[in-house]
C-alpha cells in the first residue's frame, strides 16, 4: 500500500466529515441559487442567512459584516482591491512581500498596472521582513 503525504495545505485542506455531512443536502438536493427569487432557493437562502448569523455571533459582529467567498484567491483579490480602491485618495502605495501567495502577487501586479505603487519586500530565510525595509517602504 502506497502512503501519500500532502504538503499543499495552503491550496486546500481535508474537509472534516461533519462539514461534509452538513453540506451534503446542498450538493445533492437543495442546490438552487440562494440569490434567485424562486421558491426552490428558499432553503438555501435561509441556510446562508443562518450561517452568516452564526459566524457573526462567534466573531461578535453584525451578520451584514460577514461575506462568503468561493476561495482564498477570490477573498485575497476582493480584500486587496477593495482596500486599494476605497483608500486611493489617501495614497496608492501597497506594501507586501515577495513570498505571498500568487493571488496576492497577481492582484498586486493588477493594481500596479492601474497606477498603484506596489512595493515587494524581501524576506530572510525564516520568512521575516526587515523592519528597516518596512520603515523605508512606508516613508518613501
Model-inferred region functions:
Residues 1-140:
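Pyridoxal 5′-phosphate
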Amino acid at each position: 500500500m502506497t502512503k501519500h503525504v500532502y504538503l499543499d495545505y495552503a491550496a486546500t485542506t481535508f474537509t472534516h466529515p461533519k462539514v461534509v455531512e452538513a453540506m451534503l443536502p446542498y450538493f445533492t438536493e437543495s442546490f438552487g441559487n440562494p440569490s434567485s427569487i424562486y421558491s426552490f432557493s428558499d432553503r438555501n437562502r435561509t441556510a446562508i442567512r443562518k450561517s452568516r448569523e452564526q459566524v457573526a455571533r462567534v466573531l461578535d459582529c453584525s451578520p451584514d459584516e460577514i461575506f462568503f467567498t468561493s476561495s482564498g484567491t477570490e477573498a485575497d483579490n476582493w480584500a486587496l482591491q477593495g482596500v486599494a480602491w476605497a483608500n486611493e485618495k489617501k495614497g496608492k502605495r501597497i506594501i507586501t512581500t515577495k513570498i505571498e501567495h500568487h493571488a496576492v502577487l497577481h492582484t498586486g501586479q493588477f493594481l500596479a498596472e492601474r497606477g498603484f505603487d506596489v512595493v515587494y519586500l524581501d524576506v530572510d530565510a525564516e520568512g521575516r521582513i526587515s523592519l528597516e525595509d518596512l520603515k523605508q517602504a512606508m516613508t518613501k
